């Protein structure tokens, strides 16, 4: 039996593509437009990121560029995956949906988690993670979902049966789909918790980055709670399952771009603020001053209160003196102006003898 071609679609087009052009079901065209705009925006950010590398003054912001590029790849994949849910479910779109949905979101949430971990150190004035460590954390966290998805696909498809997803009943398919995303839900909770820790610190400049992650995760959690709730409702019309999932993909993709990518790009070229780091000058750092026992320990002694100072060797310690201590001056040599003296006459004795003779 021949099916009627919907208004807006050309003749000879396969029925699974009708949602892309059917004017009667406008949601497909709307989501297609939103997803296409997201793809273009993501590509624009990815092309802009290498150009901004030379303009980033802060080395710790520059360390995040590879991880943020990986994040943009995940966002680009999310917008691209939206088309797999607009197109009808069959042997090709079924494995794609189950395999890529969790992997792409695990990449995005892992990048946000790695960024949040680095921010928890920066906001407390500690040494941040290196570029390779941040990128390694993001890749490592996302690989777990890859293993889970591959194992599920292989076991479910039994290696060759690609139509198994379309053959499953809608409730069973939805349950398997949500259970497959258990690790992604764990990543979301962990990232949200870690982003809240970025508000606990004395260096407020890095809290703005933490606020971007916190807001992104808060909105993402709201979207996920909404679509999982609708998908698991027993009395809900199952014809809208693809609409719910494709809408969740497009909405979450734009949340990533507007709540995280855009403000982060705006902060990339911001001038390095010295207040965002611990003071490196030793003069300004609090230090342990060597105790001067002659000053502090003798300042309130009863003897010095009465005498005013105490002599120890050649140094006088005053109770409230500075570190320039008083010292005894060496005794000065006495001198006097020479005066004229009358010398006794050599004939004094002679004259006395003469008179006595």
Curated annotation (Swiss-Prot):
Reported modifications of this chain: Phosphorylated in two conserved double-tyrosine motifs, Tyr-317/Tyr-320 and Tyr-347/Tyr-350, by EGFR; leading to inactivation of the tumor suppressive function of GPRC5A in lung cancer cells. Tyr-317 and Tyr-320 are the preferred residues responsible for EGFR-mediated GPRC5A phosphorylation.
Family listed: Belongs to the G-protein coupled receptor 3 family.
Summary of subunit composition and partner proteins: Interacts (via its transmembrane domain) with EGFR.
Glycosylation site list: 158
UniProt topological domain (Extracellular) ranges: 1-33, 90-97, 151-176, 234-247
Keywords from the named record: Cell membrane, Cytoplasmic vesicle, G-protein coupled receptor, Glycoprotein, Membrane, Phosphoprotein, Receptor, Transducer, Transmembrane, Transmembrane helix, Tumor suppressor
Tissue expression from the record: Expressed at high level in fetal and adult lung tissues but repressed in most human lung cancers. Constitutively expressed in fetal kidney and adult placenta, kidney, prostate, testis, ovary, small intestine, colon, stomach, and spinal cord at low to moderate levels. Not detectable in fetal heart, brain, and liver and adult heart, brain, liver, skeletal muscle, pancreas, spleen, thymus, and peripheral leukocytes. According to PubMed:10783259, expressed at low but detectable level in pancreas and heart.
Protein name according to UniProt: Retinoic acid-induced protein 3
UniProt organism field: Homo sapiens (Human)
GO molecular function: cadherin binding; G protein-coupled receptor activity; protein kinase activator activity
Annotated CDD domains: 7tmC_RAIG1_4_GPRC5A_D (cd15279)
InterPro entries documented for this protein: GPCR_3_C, RA-inducible_GPCR3
Principal location class: membrane
Residues the record lists as Phosphotyrosine modifications: 317, 320, 347, 350
Membrane topology classification: Multi-pass membrane protein
Residues in the Cytoplasmic compartment per record: 55-68, 119-129, 198-212, 269-357
GO BP terms: negative regulation of epidermal growth factor-activated receptor activity; signal transduction
One family name in Pfam for this protein: 7tm_3
């Amino acid at each position: 039996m021949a099916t009627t071609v919907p208004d807006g679609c050309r003749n000879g087009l396969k029925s699974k593509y009708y949602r892309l052009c059917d004017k009667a079901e406008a949601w497909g065209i709307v989501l297609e437009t939103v997803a296409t705009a997201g793809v273009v925006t993501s590509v624009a950010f990815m092309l802009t990121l290498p150009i901004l590398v030379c303009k980033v003054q802060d080395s710790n912001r520059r360390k995040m560029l590879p991880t943020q590029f990986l994040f943009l790849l995940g966002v680009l994949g999310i917008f691209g995956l939206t088309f797999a849910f607009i197109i009808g479910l069959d042997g090709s779109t079924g494995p794609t949906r189950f395999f890529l949905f969790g992997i792409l979101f695990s990449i995005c949430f892992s990048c946000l988690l790695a960024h949040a971990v680095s921010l928890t150190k920066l906001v407390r004035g500690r040494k941040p993670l290196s570029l390779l460590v941040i990128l390694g954390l993001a890749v490592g966290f996302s690989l777990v979902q890859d293993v889970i998805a591959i194992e599920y696909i292989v076991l479910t498809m039994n290696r060759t049966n690609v139509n198994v997803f379309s053959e499953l009943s809608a409730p069973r398919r939805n349950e398997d789909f949500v259970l497959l995303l258990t690790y992604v839900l764990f990543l979301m909770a962990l990232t949200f918790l870690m982003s809240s820790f970025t508000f606990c610190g004395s260096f407020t400049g890095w809290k703005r980055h933490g606020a971007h992650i916190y807001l992104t995760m808060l909105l993402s959690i709201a979207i996920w709670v909404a679509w999982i709730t609708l998908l698991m409702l027993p009395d809900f019309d199952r014809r809208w399952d693809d609409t719910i999932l494709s809408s969740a993909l497009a909405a979450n993709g734009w949340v990533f771009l507007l709540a995280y990518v855009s403000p982060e790009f705006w902060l990339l070229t911001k001038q390095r603020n010295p207040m965002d780091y611990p003071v490196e000058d030793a003069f300004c750092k609090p230090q342990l001053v060597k105790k001067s026992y002659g000053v502090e320990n003798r300042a309130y002694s009863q003897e010095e209160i009465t005498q005013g100072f105490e002599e120890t060797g050649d140094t006088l310690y005053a109770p409230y003196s500075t570190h320039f201590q008083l010292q005894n001056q060496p005794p000065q040599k006495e001198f006097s102006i020479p005066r004229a003296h009358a010398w006794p006459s050599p004939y004094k004795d002679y004259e006395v003898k003469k008179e006595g003779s």
